[in-house]
């Protein structure tokens, strides 16, 4: 090869290779690839550490319930809460430390914020609690920009997707991973929040064939929390979410059940007891202990397949 023509041939080769690369590379590859989930920063790094987060929005949902939105350390942060887990809020109220557990209604895919839906128990509205709820009233009195301490993740149940649940009998035990085809859910009042968290995770995954059946108990129709969200999921995923309501004091024309959760209601609206059916419950202790557990056992559900938040 002529020494003078060698640089020309090399230059032409570089141009050809560059043109071929630009022509053959996939469309849209100029954009920055999305961050893998494990690279997205998480706000909750250590379950023993308290993380102060600021209140950035407050929205009234109904007569006694509000949605509180807290900001995460940056717009790219997620909370870092596995499905099935909850967080603890802690605050000094009248000189005493008050700690309460909550399950966010926002997804852990949401970046930059976390949402809590809280029923506010005001003073002198419930004869058994004349002082009202300490934490709920504290939240209600927070101003935009005020911070409160978050701690987590916490809880004995984690949903790993596609019917796989890691469940611990207590905090000191190792989790046992079990697979279920159907999740029977019973919720009362604000106990709907962990159910919605689980329902959203299951219905968001088109490859997850797990079916959820939910009985949701409330006092009146106006007390039904997150009804629009539940009804929307049911409309969009009728084969994956079976939804039923019951009210203590229904209005005229109410088309669902009336009264406390009972065995007949469970038989009609939950899957029959089986080894591949998991029952999860969350609500007032009296409802769980007096209405739910005895009737579930009577219908043949095994204790090892029943989980109460």
From Swiss-Prot:
<dbReference type="InterPro" id="IPR017938">
    <property type="entry name" value="Riboflavin_synthase-like_b-brl"/>
</dbReference>
<comment type="function">
    <text>NADH-cytochrome b5 reductases are involved in desaturation and elongation of fatty acids, cholesterol biosynthesis and drug metabolism.</text>
</comment>
<keyword id="KW-1207">Sterol metabolism</keyword>
<feature type="binding site">
    <location>
        <begin position="140"/>
        <end position="170"/>
    </location>
    <ligand>
        <name>FAD</name>
    </ligand>
</feature>
<keyword id="KW-0752">Steroid biosynthesis</keyword>
<keyword id="KW-0472">Membrane</keyword>
<dbReference type="Pfam" id="PF00970">
    <property type="entry name" value="FAD_binding_6"/>
</dbReference>
<dbReference type="InterPro" id="IPR001433">
    <property type="entry name" value="OxRdtase_FAD/NAD-bd"/>
</dbReference>
<feature type="domain" description="FAD-binding FR-type">
    <location>
        <begin position="48"/>
        <end position="160"/>
    </location>
</feature>
<dbReference type="InterPro" id="IPR001709">
    <property type="entry name" value="Flavoprot_Pyr_Nucl_cyt_Rdtase"/>
</dbReference>
<feature type="binding site">
    <location>
        <begin position="179"/>
        <end position="214"/>
    </location>
    <ligand>
        <name>FAD</name>
    </ligand>
</feature>
<dbReference type="InterPro" id="IPR017927">
    <property type="entry name" value="FAD-bd_FR_type"/>
</dbReference>
<keyword id="KW-0443">Lipid metabolism</keyword>
<keyword id="KW-0520">NAD</keyword>
<dbReference type="GO" id="GO:0001878">
    <property type="term" value="P:response to yeast"/>
</dbReference>
<comment type="similarity">
    <text>Belongs to the flavoprotein pyridine nucleotide cytochrome reductase family.</text>
</comment>
<keyword id="KW-1133">Transmembrane helix</keyword>
<dbReference type="InterPro" id="IPR008333">
    <property type="entry name" value="Cbr1-like_FAD-bd_dom"/>
</dbReference>
<keyword id="KW-0812">Transmembrane</keyword>
<keyword id="KW-0444">Lipid biosynthesis</keyword>
<dbReference type="GO" id="GO:0005739">
    <property type="term" value="C:mitochondrion"/>
</dbReference>
<keyword id="KW-0274">FAD</keyword>
<dbReference type="GO" id="GO:0016126">
    <property type="term" value="P:sterol biosynthetic process"/>
</dbReference>
<dbReference type="Pfam" id="PF00175">
    <property type="entry name" value="NAD_binding_1"/>
</dbReference>
<dbReference type="GO" id="GO:0004128">
    <property type="term" value="F:cytochrome-b5 reductase activity, acting on NAD(P)H"/>
</dbReference>
<protein>
    <recommendedName>
        <fullName>NADH-cytochrome b5 reductase 2</fullName>
        <ecNumber>1.6.2.2</ecNumber>
    </recommendedName>
</protein>
<keyword id="KW-0756">Sterol biosynthesis</keyword>
<dbReference type="GO" id="GO:0071949">
    <property type="term" value="F:FAD binding"/>
</dbReference>
<dbReference type="InterPro" id="IPR039261">
    <property type="entry name" value="FNR_nucleotide-bd"/>
</dbReference>
<dbReference type="InterPro" id="IPR001834">
    <property type="entry name" value="CBR-like"/>
</dbReference>
<keyword id="KW-0285">Flavoprotein</keyword>
<dbReference type="GO" id="GO:0016020">
    <property type="term" value="C:membrane"/>
</dbReference>
<keyword id="KW-0753">Steroid metabolism</keyword>
<keyword id="KW-0560">Oxidoreductase</keyword>
<feature type="transmembrane region" description="Helical">
    <location>
        <begin position="3"/>
        <end position="23"/>
    </location>
</feature>
């Amino acid at each position: 090869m002529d020494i003078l023509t060698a640089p020309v041939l090399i230059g032409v080769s570089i141009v050809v290779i560059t043109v071929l690369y630009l022509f053959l590379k996939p469309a849209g590859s100029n954009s920055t690839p999305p961050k893998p989930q494990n690279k997205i920063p998480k706000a909750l790094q250590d379950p023993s550490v308290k993380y102060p987060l600021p209140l950035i929005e407050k929205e009234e949902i109904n007569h006694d319930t509000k949605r509180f939105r807290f900001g995460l350390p940056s717009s790219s942060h997620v909370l870092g809460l596995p499905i099935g887990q909850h967080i603890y809020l802690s605050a000094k109220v009248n000189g005493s430390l008050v700690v309460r557990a909550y399950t966010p209604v926002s997804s852990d895919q949401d970046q930059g914020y976390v949402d809590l839906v809280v029923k506010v128990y005001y003073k002198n509205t419930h004869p058994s609690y004349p002082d009202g709820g300490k934490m709920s009233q504290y939240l209600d009195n927070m101003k935009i920009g005020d911070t409160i301490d978050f701690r987590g993740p916490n809880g004995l149940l984690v949903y790993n997707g596609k019917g796989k649940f890691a469940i611990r009998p207590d905090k000191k035990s190792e989790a046992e991973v079990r697979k279920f085809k159907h999740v029977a859910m019973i919720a009362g009042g604000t106990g709907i929040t962990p159910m919605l968290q689980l329902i959203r995770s299951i219905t968001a995954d088109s490859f997850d064939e797990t079916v959820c059946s939910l009985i949701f108990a409330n006092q009146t129709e106006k007390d039904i929390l997150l009804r629009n969200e539940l009804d929307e999921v049911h409309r969009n995923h009728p084969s994956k979410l079976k939804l039923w309501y019951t009210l203590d004091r229904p209005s005229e024309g109410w088309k669902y059940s009336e009264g406390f959760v009972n065995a007949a209601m469970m038989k009609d609206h939950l899957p029959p007891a089986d080894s591949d059916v998991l029952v999860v419950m969350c609500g007032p202790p009296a409802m769980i202990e007096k209405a739910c557990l005895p009737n579930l056992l009577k219908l043949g559900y095994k204790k090892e397949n029943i989980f109460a938040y």
